[in-house]
Amino acid sequence: PASDSGFLRDP
């Protein structure tokens, strides 16, 4: 998800 670490990995 996008809300994981602060960067877009898999929105």
Curated annotation (Swiss-Prot):
The keyword Secreted applies. One of its GO terms (cellular component) is extracellular region. Its main location: secreted. The keyword Iron-sulfur does not apply. FMRFamides and FMRFamide-like peptides are neuropeptides. Belongs to the FARP (FMRF amide related peptide) family. This is Extended FMRFamide-10. The lineage of its organism: Eukaryota, Metazoa, Ecdysozoa, Arthropoda, Hexapoda.
